[in-house]
């Protein structure tokens, strides 16, 4: 009866969801919003600033946001008041300093705009000091020993380069989080420091090379994978509720064997969910662009258009939050765990990274003739060198207990770091190293054999899905990230590594005359390739042969998080981060401690959950089934029916 009642409840819920989807579709058809008209409507954007700020203050704010100038204290009150007026016009009653502590997820504390003016009266107020600084309890967040209960003071500091927004009647102000002594206690502060380090190093090198460049910025487009499952089914699984993944279970009769889920047609329920997700993200200024079914059943992906790394990081945090919150509106649960189900693919987050000039010119764009693009080839050589020298840091940047289940499991890149460049770039670099002239032999037209179709232009590189760090036309795609990872750490490390190599190149080229620059650059590229070409690999990263070859080349294979994390504070890594003012020694040691603690706590929680389920759910079910079988056997015996053992039956098989 209980099972029948539960099934009836599920049927009623599903019917209700279908009716609501149809109703929502009809209502949406009536109002048919145009995205252009409401995109970013909940963001305190530059157009909103123009409307709410005096012109002189607006210009100063643009200098802060675009040129990195310090915010004058005298305009802080004006900006805060304008921000409050805009937010209240959007229905906001509270504000919060929105930050990203070392938990990897966002944190917020909501304060109302009201201030008392009498026994029963208030005034809405928001001042510059409240905008610029907040004070949460730093000891209540992971700090790796940087803070304790008896020294708990911490500060949040407004980040004016990431736009404030309104969500659920609250003004969200993106902020940094630091301790009383200025130590970074969050994910965002080191990311901004690494952006500064890369900007400084890249501008210096490019100007030495003869390019008049004043500023560069890194850009990222993170592709977000996730699973959707029915909410009622989710609630039946204690392991999913507690750990985000299944700890027990049987393989389904049909998984992903037929390759028929990838890019498949979307159900009405999922389509309605995606439409609501898109609308919520577009209101928040997130460039949600592409969505589709992924390889595993019930797995999907959402990919945005790239934007500056700091904003991309904030927007990815918003994306994960919206994906999970909107799911409940449709009777669904969004799973962001890296490996929620055994036997099918897990979920990752491809990090598409590049950097460009202040005019928007992509430094990693090879152009029509990559072999003649000496700027691109120089930067490419620096990246190759950096990835080879700091394999351990790139592996550490994606290390987690959940991601260990994905990496190297024939669904995600292996734990061995390598670079894939594609046929053309690999051939160009081989020719440069050998001192030969590169001859282009690649056929760039694809003939489909259909008379009505013209030839299709073919990319110069194929797509190697097994490579952890692949060049994909005008960017590098770092594919090792787990689906729920905060992208700040991988990008902080990547920025710092590249900043170091560009600095070394600049040191070597600083005294070279301009007329000798091309010759010096080619010699530098040749030397770099001779020393670091071992990191370049174009084959199948899933194969056992590659593991053997990688060992011969001397590449690291840090299979698990426990193998990788102790390398975080190796002397060369400490020196790297301190040199570029990204982490101090204490900040780096703290992060190593936090990650190790998180690793064993996650594993411990999973073990406790398994033991509880075994004792309270699985063993009682087994004992109950055994009792039923024993009762059946006893009933048959009392009826004169002889029980035949399984072993006896097998003995008669031929």
Placement of each model-derived feature along the sequence:
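Glycine-rich, acidic/polar active-site loops that bind/position phosphate-bearing ligands
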Residues: 151-336, 345-348, 354-593
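Gly-rich Lys/Arg/Thr-decorated short loops/hinges at beta-loop-alpha junctions or inter-strand turns
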Residues: 35-45, 254-262
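Single conserved hydrophobic/aromatic residue that forms the stacking wall/gate
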Residues: 1-11, 648
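C-terminal substrate/ligand-recognition segments
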Residues: 604-625
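A short, hydrophobic C-terminal helix/tail in secreted or cell-surface proteins
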Residues: 651-654
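Generic long, charged, amphipathic alpha-helical segments
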Residues: 635-649
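Short, positively charged and aromatic/hydrophobic N-terminal segments
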Residues: 15-24, 28
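Active-site core of metal-dependent hydrolases
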Residues: 21, 38-151
